[in-house]
């Protein structure tokens, strides 16, 4: 997949879909708080000076020096739950992100959040 230690270097990389179509630029990576595995990325989409951040899954993703390729298609990614470019993910928004991609969502054993940004 990729070396987790290099994630900070990815910010600003173009994110492309499984067919090479550009989705947007990588903004941040969200980790599963239980496993510490990178789980979702936020990708900036929309016009410069505006736009929003959509969540795309990192399972099956591949990184190269020029881009991050995810396994979802561009339309599915752009229709994904989003936050404003200055926004924060609320705990109540986590189930919708997982559900959009058909992934199971479970809160932690003590009710803690599932996703944390780095």
Each language-model region and where it sits:
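Peripheral interaction segments used for macromolecular assembly
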Residues: 1-118
């Amino acid at each position: 997949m990729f070396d987790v230690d290099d994630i900070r270097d990815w910010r600003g990389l173009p994110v492309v879909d499984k067919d090479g179509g550009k989705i947007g630029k990588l903004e941040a990576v969200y980790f599963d708080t239980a496993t510490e595995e990178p789980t979702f990325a936020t990708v900036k989409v929309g016009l410069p000076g505006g736009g929003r951040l959509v969540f795309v899954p990192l399972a099956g993703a591949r990184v190269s020096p020029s881009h991050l390729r995810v396994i979802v298609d561009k339309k599915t990614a752009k229709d994904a739950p989003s936050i404003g470019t200055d926004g924060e993910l609320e705990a109540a928004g986590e189930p919708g992100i997982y559900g959009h991609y058909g992934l199971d969502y479970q809160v932690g054993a003590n009710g803690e959040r599932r996703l944390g940004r780095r």
